[in-house]
């Protein structure tokens, strides 16, 4: 990841070069895992690793799927090479990229899942009001810390760039109060309509959601939104 303070507090941050090399690090790590999963041992020597007769038993009976987040050019390339499922934050520019990729007819190895924050209320107006109230009450100190960390990332075009945006962004575009995750909001019918349109536009294989209150949110989605979806 790019959030250096999370690693520095435990003495685990490798240094500034890791911003640019983290996908190479991850690729080598996956190569080691594949050695262990397919042969049970690894002696792999590489830029980041120096293994000597390492074992991992028992070996899996079937291929283990690789799930990876990837939005920057380097992240997308990593997914192209290694991932079975790719996770993306559903910001408008990302949705446009997915649409272009779908229209191009290019083959892809992995499935794509879009991350959104969901607010479902009885009316569209109430749902928007709830979202805007969260922005008004946002923890500005925490957001400032998050932005300062994101600004250090030298890997351009990834999720850290989305984090740098301000509290002035519309809910749908990924406001900092929601850690740059776009909010899909409205009545059950409106939310279902938006999800169907997004699925058709992007060809996404699925969605991931976060909620203000996950118990209430999951119940509302399952009982009121899911039955209205045509994309499932």
Q: Language-model segments: which ranges?
A:
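Conserved, mostly hydrophobic/aromatic
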Residues: 33, 66, 79, 127, ...
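Residues that line or immediately flank small-molecule/substrate-binding pockets and catalytic motifs
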Residues: 37, 70-71, 90, 211
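Long hydrophobic segments that form regular secondary structure
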Residues: 72, 77-86, 92-97
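Substrate-recognition/cap regions that form aromatic- and gly/pro-loop-enriched pockets
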Residues: 165, 195-197, 205-222, 227
